[in-house]
């Protein structure tokens, strides 16, 4: 078990070394007459289908300041704490098998600590682009450079934080872009088929937490999702997170398959005045829709809130809505047809059917943008309003993202030598899509945060 002292050392090492290993050698590789560096974080948008992306200034600022302040505090601690200094040296020796490099870096960190104790902050200037719902790719998002007359031996700090900034920023901003894209799709079908659009805020529910790679990833995604929707099962995602009571298969199977009707009845009676979601495919969802639900119809109609039925398996192209539906052939019926048959619907002002308010559909099995679009289009062609369904969007959408989805990168774009700034730009002939921007940028939309 880790004691307090060991835990504190590990904490500081994470602040100091949250970077790719090669970053520690770059400070030894820049030209000796380097006076300053200027680097930029941007999204290239090379590989995805997106034409624009979402950028949240406040989130990026929070990350950057946490990273910078944590680094500063831990650098100062190295000078004060001999055990930490020794641990830092030992760690670098184990990674590089180079005692000279390890000792020199630790000494350099102690020298930096003296500077920080005197000046209270790193000799850097960081600017972050203001928030925007639709930025073009290759827009400068974060710029970092040394202060004027930065000590030459600290110039390396400009590029040192690339790794930790990217790893903490790309997922949130990418998930935000995806959530906004889905909301735009929901708005499109709502405007075409619904009388009002307020239901959209709860139409896309975050199911992703269990499929994310870590708690931190889940929280980044949840926070991004909650910028556009209020429905989320990630309780810790934000103060505006909302959910309802819902069963899972362990609940629906607890009484056994022979008592499935009893299970539904028990839950409907126990939570008669609360919104409730019940999963229906633990055994045979078609039996639930064709036999169990109609037997409980009066109980459902007497409830004080909506019952949402959730399918969790099957072919999505026949499950919710079947384009080959024939009224006389029950084998072609989908969920929407059964629920309309049992509970009826009304026609809204735009001529589309809206199910009885006591019943609804929620579907969250492997949901993607493409599946949502297909289902909403099928419902529309079938004469139904888009408000009849809620989607549970999980890791099939949010975990299947990576840094290249929007092409987030952090690159050196200018270097100061001989008292003159020179633009720096990479242009690999093997893949010109990876070309970087060059030079320094001035715009009022880049706000100084450090």
Swiss-Prot record:
It comes from the Bacteria. The keyword Transferase applies. Keywords: Glycosyltransferase, Pyridine nucleotide biosynthesis, Transferase. GO terms for biological process: NAD biosynthetic process. Pathway: Cofactor biosynthesis; NAD(+) biosynthesis; nicotinamide D-ribonucleotide from 5-phospho-alpha-D-ribose 1-diphosphate and nicotinamide: step 1/1. The keyword Glycosyltransferase applies. It catalyses: beta-nicotinamide D-ribonucleotide + diphosphate = 5-phospho-alpha-D-ribose 1-diphosphate + nicotinamide + H(+). Signal peptide: none annotated. GO terms for molecular function: nicotinamide phosphoribosyltransferase activity. Its EC number is 2.4.2.12. Beta-nicotinamide D-ribonucleotide binds at residues 233, 310-312, 364-365, 403. Diphosphate binds at residues 210, 249, 310. Catalyzes the condensation of nicotinamide with 5-phosphoribosyl-1-pyrophosphate to yield nicotinamide mononucleotide, an intermediate in the biosynthesis of NAD. Belongs to the NAPRTase family. NCBIfam families: PRK09198.1. This is Nicotinamide phosphoribosyltransferase. It comes from Mycoplasma genitalium (strain ATCC 33530 / DSM 19775 / NCTC 10195 / G37). The lineage of its organism: Bacteria, Bacillati, Mycoplasmatota, Mycoplasmoidales, Mycoplasmoidaceae.
């Amino acid at each position: 078990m880790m004691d307090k002292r060991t835990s504190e050392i590990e904490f500081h090492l994470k602040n100091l070394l949250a970077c790719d290993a090669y970053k520690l050698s770059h400070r030894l590789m820049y030209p000796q007459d380097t006076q300053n560096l200027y680097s930029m974080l941007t999204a290239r948008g090379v590989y995805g289908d997106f034409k624009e992306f979402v950028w949240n200034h406040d989130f990026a600022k929070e990350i950057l300041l946490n990273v910078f302040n944590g680094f500063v505090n831990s650098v100062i601690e190295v000078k004060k704490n001999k055990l930490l200094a020794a641990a830092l040296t030992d760690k670098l020796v184990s990674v590089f098998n180079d005692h000279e490099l390890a000792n020199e870096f630790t000494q350099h960190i102690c020298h930096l600590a003296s500077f920080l104790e005197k000046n209270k902050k790193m000799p850097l200037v960081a600017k972050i682009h203001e928030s925007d719902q639709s930025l073009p790719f290759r827009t400068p998002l974060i710029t970092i450079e040394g202060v004027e007359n930065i000590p030459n031996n600290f110039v390396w700090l400009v590029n040192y934080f690339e790794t930790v900034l990217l790893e903490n920023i790309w997922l949130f901003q990418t998930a935000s872009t995806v959530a906004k894209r889905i909301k735009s799709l929901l708005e499109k079908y709502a405007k075409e088929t619904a009388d009002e659009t307020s239901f959209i805020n709860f139409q896309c529910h975050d199911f992703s937490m269990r499929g994310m790679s870590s708690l931190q990833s889940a929280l980044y995604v949840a926070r991004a999702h909650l910028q556009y929707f209020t429905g989320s099962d990630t309780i810790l995602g934000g103060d505006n997170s909302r959910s309802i009571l819902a069963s899972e298969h362990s609940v629906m199977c607890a009484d056994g398959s022979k008592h499935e009707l009893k299970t539904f009845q028990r839950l409907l009676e126990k939570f008669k005045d609360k919104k409730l979601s019940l999963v229906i495919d633990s055994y045979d969802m078609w039996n639930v829709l064709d036999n169990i639900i109609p037997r409980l119809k009066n109980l459902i109609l007497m409830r004080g809130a909506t019952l949402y039925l959730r399918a969790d398996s099957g072919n999505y192209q026949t499950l919710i809505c079947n384009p080959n539906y024939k009224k006389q052939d029950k084998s072609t019926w989908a969920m929407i047809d059964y629920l309309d048959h049992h509970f009826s619907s009304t026609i809204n002002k735009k001529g589309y059917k809206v199910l009885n308010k006591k019943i609804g559909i929620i579907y969250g099995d492997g949901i993607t943008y493409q599946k949502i679009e297909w289902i909403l289009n099928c419902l529309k062609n079938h004469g139904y309003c888009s408000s009849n369904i809620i989607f549970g969007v999980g890791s099939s959408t949010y975990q299947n993202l990576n840094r290249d989805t929007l092409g987030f990168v952090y690159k050196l774009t200018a270097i100061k030598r001989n008292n003159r700034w020179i633009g720096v730009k990479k242009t690999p002939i093997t893949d010109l899509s990876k070309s970087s921007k060059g030079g320094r940028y001035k715009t009022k939309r880049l706000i100084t945060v450090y």
